[in-house]
Amino acid sequence: MGYCAEKVYMDKQGVIRWTENKKEVALFGANYCLPSACDFRAAGYVGGERKQMIVEDLEHFKRMNWDGLRLCFWGDYQNTDREGNLQENEHLHLLDYLIAEADKRDIYMLLSPIVTYNSQWPEMSDTTNTGLAKYYPKNTLIHDEEAIRAQENYMKQLLNHRNPYTGRSLKDEPNILFVELINEPTQFPEDIPGMVR
């Protein structure tokens, strides 16, 4: 399927615009994280079939005229190993399904694949997380060379991962407009150059 033309761009003033008509991008939606962490577990508590719940949620969102979602995906906890190798599991399969279903409904997405907050919140009862976050705490993600390599590895594998529902790599999904590398990274005001290298 190959490269996907960019639907948006940033102008010289830092405003994100649609490539097609040059209008400012203005989307409305919310965070959505049923494929992982607390929402994944909550669906299990009520005996829900997660794929059907995704469809029902997206139908509600469309009825409310939502056109944007921030996909919070705890890959740093639930879908990687220490080196950042992508792990195939139900969380990833549900993310693929969610992306395909959102795409069908013309819902645009911001993908946030490194969340940094423990995926076991609020219960904190499961200690089986295998992800890179188990080895690299939030405050090491920007400066620690091993942590940076693990994140680079994870991001490359995730963005090149082929979605079986769409047949496209995540990097080529037309409705994923943005990728937020690290959710709420630790700030180091005494080392601004080190934060933006």
Kindly give the residue locations of the regions a language model identified.
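Active-site mouth of glycoside hydrolases
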Residues: 7-197
